[in-house]
Structures are given as C-alpha cells and as structure tokens.
Amino acid sequence: LENGISFTEFTYQILQAIDFYHLNKDDGVQMQIGGSDQWGNITAGIDLIHKLEGADRPAFGLTIPLMLKADGTKFGKSAGGAVWLDPEKTSPYEFYQFWINQDDRDVVKYLKYFTFLSREEIEDLAEKTEKEPWKRAAQKKLAEEVTKFVHGEAGLKEAQMITDALFSGDIKNLSVTQIEQGLKNAPSAEVANETKNIVDFLVDTKIEPSKRQAREDVKNGAIYVNGDREQSLDFEVDPASAFDGKYVIIRKGKRKYTLVK
C-alpha cells in the first residue's frame, strides 16, 4: 500500500454489504448474483444480514465464473474496450468491428456464448479457423450473428457496407452519418474553407510531415481524395467536393484514413 487506496475502493465491500442488507430487509431480496470476483462482497452482505436480522434470515449468494479473454483479462466495461447495446454509445459499425476483431483463441468460445448456432456449425467454423485462420470465417460469422441479433438486419447490412467501403476504398456511396461511424476513431484535422493545392493541403493537415514527402506520395499514387487517387501535383482540393459540405476524406496508402473538416 505504498500509494494508498481510494475511498471508493476502501468502502466498496462495506457499501455493497449494506446495500444487500437493505434490499433484503426492505424489499425481501434473498439472493445476490455476481461475477466470481464479487464473492467476498456478496458474503460480506450475507454476514451482515445474519448478524443484524438473525442467522435464520434467508440470504444467499450465487457467483458466475468471469468470462476471460485469451490474455487473461476480463471481458467487460471495467477492463476497458467494452461495447454497448445502445447504438448511441456504440454504433452498429463499431459493434460489428468489435466482434470481427476477436482473437482466434477466443472466437469459438464466443460463438458458443453469444450465438444460437448449432454445435455442428460451430465445430465447422472452429475447424476452418484452425486450418485457414487468415480467412477469419469464425470472426465474420460471430460479428454477423451478434450484430444482427442486437441491431437487426438493417444494422448488420449498414455495418457490412461501411466495412466493405473502407476496406476497398470505395467510399463515395457512404452517407455522412456512415462516414462518421466508420471514421470515428480515425485521425482528424481542420482546415480553412478555401481551395488548396494538394501538397499544401496534406502538410497543413499534418497528413504529411513535409512538402517533399507529400509530393513523393502524390506522384507514387499513395494519396486518395474522397475515394479517388490523385497523382497530379497541380490538383486542387476544393471545399465544394466535401461530403455534404462537411468532410474531405484523405486516404494514404491502403487504409490510413484522415477525416478533414
């Protein structure tokens, strides 16, 4: 305890025990259910109930094994990187990406937990993952099933459409809302609402570290503006070409996007 502990951490078990006591006494709640890491907190509540209300007072605890990822960390919001069912907090695209990026070591387990696929289907996907992991068949099926279950067929199709567009670079048919979903975590920049030469634009938005590098990447065909490859050093980035008048999308290389406002 060289650095001490917070008041919240110090009182957590006490407050949870008191909470269980009041729920038991005032509302007749007899059982508390939690993850296996909550065993001590739950039994503290049971002990408090028995001391204050008598040893014969019905009070029980039930714990469920924690779902751990292959690296041993918890699968949950307290461990960071969790997803929400609410599309306002986690968009269908983000939700889909979360599942499609699961580790090969976890994906079969998640298919069993979170989908209604038959044992035969899951075993077939497990075999495909073992033989051809680069195809990510199990991850794609997991993402498809869970996204459809939570966000419906429309949410799944939108997530797949955004995924395919960003992967291929063909973003012209995406709406502004879909672009914002897909590039929510991409680098962003702001520039003045004026026409600029492509080289100056790339440097001003810090997409390129120097004009020399910008010229080189443009000439080599590494720069895409709103989905189109631009190789002319005379090209002008015009605000009028922005998506819905809001964004110019720059792609450098295969999939390095920047959202420019």
Task: Describe the residue ranges of each PLM region.
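Divalent-metal (Mg2+/Mn2+/Ca2+)-assisted nucleotide/phosphate chemistry catalytic cores
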Residues: 1-63
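Conserved nucleotide- and phosphate/pyrophosphate-binding catalytic cores
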Residues: 49, 53-261
